[in-house]
């Protein structure tokens, strides 16, 4: 399970700055899509090959009222469910009453907590450690989030408490590397062959996610139908999501449910308690995400936040618009227009209009799940990907840079789930985003991929002679001397004739 780290602290101690620094490598992917909100409180981050989730819990000062009090309540819930907490304090401002209140709360919860003293660029780190020692949370880890100082040491301490996972099944491979289990190889003129792997043995893992009260529990119960099995908690802490294995049409699946517990033999609908931690970890652990939205409410900001995280992780995606029944035709037309306008950045995902309560359209979700999973794990040979690249360049050439044409030479697969296509060429740093989008759409169309994002990475061509010196043999040196002597004599004769 991917660890979740919560950033905790009163307002203006630098949580957002640290969040942006930790997640910047992944934020760049989402930032390419206009219309996708940048104001997110959670993101995926990587450090030394390890993946983890960061949650910015927002500022807690202890005197919140109204909507701020509700936000503080959600922050405390995130703290409760996180694997570890980075408690941030401001070295310049010193110890405050709000710091003491938060510190007392963390001590009572017996959380894995690391005290982080930010803004030490103008304060002696030893003084900062002494200043915050009354909190009773150990020595403070000094950092300067704005400049990146102390971040590596902080992460070494925070992530060191978690066991290192085995190789990620979604890890990106190298050209010519061994085929991962469960993936397909497709060669020209051949039918794809399946290689049984762990994903097929336990079934496609499907995460049902969405805002509270959009019908996730109803959809899970409808998908399980009468073939439900005994519900059990995955080994771990009580905050873990529920993993429900089942079969349909001789295909194995595992539903990852974050909405609530059902009782065997009857449908038990409880008020859904939305958990950010459960949702984010379910996305990370899934092969395919079914994103449930309320058709009557349309697209709201929180939907975009969650979709942004799905896009970051590269998971295959199916969108389900629930509560479609009973809507007027004019309302349906408006919702479809809004989906096309606001969700264009995930236009690769199949959209289903369903009624989880009555079962309308639910059965069609499985076909999209299967297609998305297959698209996400298929592997293609270098020759095939290069041919598609050459055809795309022939049809629409990349732009000129400094009077020179960008050259894209060949492509190969760098990883699967999601497919990563590595393109080699010259001046690749100058390839515009619009042209990358053109290549993505071309690969998607030709390879007939659905439900999965495609990532393209460029690599510049290295000069094989750079840094090398041409060393002459003795024979070559003597020959060079004779030629130079001959040229000098010929030049002298030419000058003498002119006289």
Curated annotation (Swiss-Prot):
Region annotated Disordered, chain positions: 166-199, 459-499
This protein's UniProt keywords: GTP-binding, Nucleotide-binding, Repeat, Ribosome biogenesis
Biased composition (Basic and acidic residues): 190-199, 459-472
Annotated residues for binding of GTP 1: 9-16, 56-60, 118-121
GO molecular function terms listed in the Swiss-Prot or TrEMBL record: GTP binding; ribosome binding
Function: GTPase that plays an essential role in the late steps of ribosome biogenesis.
The protein's name: GTPase Der
Species in which this protein is naturally found: Stutzerimonas stutzeri (strain A1501)
Organism placement in taxonomy: Bacteria, Pseudomonadati, Pseudomonadota, Gammaproteobacteria, Pseudomonadales
């Amino acid at each position: 399970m991917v660890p979740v780290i919560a950033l905790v602290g009163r307002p203006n101690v630098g949580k957002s700055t640290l969040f942006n620094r930790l997640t910047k490598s992944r934020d760049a992917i989402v930032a390419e899509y206009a219309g996708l909100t940048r104001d997110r409180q959670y993101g995926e981050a990587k450090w030394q090959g390890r993946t983890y989730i960061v949650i910015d819990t927002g500022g807690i000062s202890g005197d919140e009222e109204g909507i701020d009090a509700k936000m503080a309540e959600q922050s405390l819930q995130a703290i409760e469910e996180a694997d570890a907490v980075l408690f941030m304090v401001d070295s310049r401002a010193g110890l405050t009453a709000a710091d003491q209140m938060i510190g007392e709360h963390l001590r009572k919860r017996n959380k894995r907590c690391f005290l982080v003293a930010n803004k030490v660029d103008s304060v002696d780190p030893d003084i900062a450690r002494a200043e915050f020692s009354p909190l009773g949370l150990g020595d403070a880890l000094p950092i300067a989030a704005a400049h990146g100082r102390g971040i590596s040491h902080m992460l070494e301490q925070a992530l060191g408490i978690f066991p290192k996972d085995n190789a990620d099944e979604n890890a990106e491979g190298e050209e010519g590397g061994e085929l991962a289990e469960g993936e397909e190889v497709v060669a020209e003129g051949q039918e794809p062959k399946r290689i049984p792997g762990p994903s097929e043995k336990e079934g496609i893992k499907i995460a049902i996610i969405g805002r509270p009260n959009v019908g996730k529990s109803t959809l899970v119960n409808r998908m399980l139908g009468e073939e439900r099995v005994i519900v059990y908690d995955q080994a771990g802490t009580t905050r873990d999501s529920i993993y429900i294995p089942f079969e349909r049409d001789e295909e194995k699946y595992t539903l990852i449910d974050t909405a609530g517990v059902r009782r065997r033999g009857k449908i038990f609908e409880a008020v859904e308690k939305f958990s950010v931690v459960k949702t984010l970890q379910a996305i990370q652990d899934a092969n395919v995400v079914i994103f449930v939205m309320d058709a009557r409410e349309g697209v709201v900001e929180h939907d975009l936040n969650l979709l942004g995280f799905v896009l970051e992780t590269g998971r295959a995606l199916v969108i389900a618009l629930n509560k479609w029944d009973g809507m007027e035709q004019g309302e349906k037309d408006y919702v479809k227009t809004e989906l096309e306008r606001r969700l264009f950045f995930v236009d690769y995902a199949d959209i289903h209009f369903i009624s989880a309560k009555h079962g309308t359209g639910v059965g069609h979700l499985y076909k999209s799940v299967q297609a998305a999973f297959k698209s996400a794990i298929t592997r293609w040979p270098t020759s095939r990907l290069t041919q598609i690249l050459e055809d795309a360049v022939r049809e629409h050439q990349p732009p000129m840079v400094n009077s020179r044409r960008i050259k894209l030479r060949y492509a190969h697969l760098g990883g699967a789930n999601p497919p990563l296509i590595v393109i080699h060429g010259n001046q690749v740093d100058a390839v515009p985003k619009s042209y990358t989008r053109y290549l993505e759409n071309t690969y998607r169309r030709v390879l007939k991929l659905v439900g999965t994002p495609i990532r393209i990475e460029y690599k510049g061509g290295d000069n094989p002679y750079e840094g090398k010196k041409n060393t002459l043999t003795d024979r070559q040196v003597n020959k060079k001397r004779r030629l130079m002597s001959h040229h000098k004599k010929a030049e002298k004769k030419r000058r003498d004739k002119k006289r």
